[in-house]
Structures are given as C-alpha cells and as structure tokens.
C-alpha cells in the first residue's frame, strides 16, 4: 500500500466517523484481544499473518483507582488492521457507549472497513 493509498483510506475513515489512533498505547488496564479476521490471537506474536484485522478492548473502569484522571472512563476499543510486511497498520479507536461491550457492533465496524480496503486495494496478500 502506497502513501497515496493510505491517505485515501484515512480520508474514508474520517468521513465515516473513525479516528486514526496511530501507534498503540499500552497501559495496565484490563484488556483482552478479540480476533475478528486473519490468523493469530495476539498481533504482537511472531509469525502472525501479514494481513489481519484484530480488535483490542480495554475496560478502563478497572484502571480508575490507579489514575484519578480516568474518573469518567468506561470501555474503549481499537481495531487494528495489519496491512504490510513492514507492519504498517491503522488503529481505529472509538468509545463504546453505555456500559455495554457490544462485540458484534465492533466486529461489524471492523468488517465494513475490511471490505472497503479489499474493494479498493485488492484482496489480502497470501502468506
């Protein structure tokens, strides 16, 4: 994927209410991986697929006692799309409303983005 293509993807994300989160932020909040597409449960493991979509869900409420600035924290989720052998990826972040962890809604959002990339830039590369 070229930089021009990446800019096109980013424009699509902004138009559709996604926020580009850049590099992942690691903290001590309770979190877990929720795999939507591709191979491998943990995206940081060696030998993972060159192309996959995976979802990281953080329950920040479990972290509030460590940081008073997180008084209003709820649950957030990010969708990562690993696109190239150089591990360039886009991280999509969005807050989950209420106190529900709606994995179906997250998966739908990830799938819609997956379809956009595949339709515009071709099928994922084979391993």
Task: Label the model's feature ranges.
Residues 25, 44, 69, 125-126:
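Generic low-complexity segments that are intrinsically disordered, proline-rich and/or Lys/Arg-biased
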Residues 5, 9-10, 84-127:
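Ampiphathic alpha-helical segments that act as solvent-exposed interaction surfaces
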Residues 42-105:
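Intrinsically disordered, low-complexity regulatory segments enriched in Ser/Thr/Pro
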Residues 18-20, 24-25, 79, 94-96, ...:
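Assembly/interface hotspot detector across virion components, adhesins/toxins, and nucleic-acid enzymes
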Residues 1-47:
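Negatively charged, low-complexity tracts enriched in Asp/Glu with abundant Ser/Thr
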Residues 22, 41, 66, 122-123:
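Selective for proline/serine-rich intrinsically disordered segments
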């Amino acid at each position: 994927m070229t930089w021009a293509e990446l800019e096109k993807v980013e424009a699509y994300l902004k138009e559709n209410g996604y926020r580009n989160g850049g590099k992942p932020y690691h903290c001590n909040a309770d979190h877990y991986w929720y795999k939507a597409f591709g191979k491998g449960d943990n995206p940081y493991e060696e030998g993972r697929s060159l192309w996959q979509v995976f979802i990281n869900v953080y329950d920040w409420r479990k972290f509030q006692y460590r940081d008073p600035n997180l008084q209003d924290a709820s649950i957030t989720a990010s969708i990562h799309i690993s696109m190239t052998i150089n591990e360039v990826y886009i991280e999509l972040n969005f807050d989950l409303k209420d106190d529900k962890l709606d994995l179906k809604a997250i998966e739908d959002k990830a799938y819609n983005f997956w379809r956009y990339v595949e339709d515009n830039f071709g099928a994922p590369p084979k391993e």
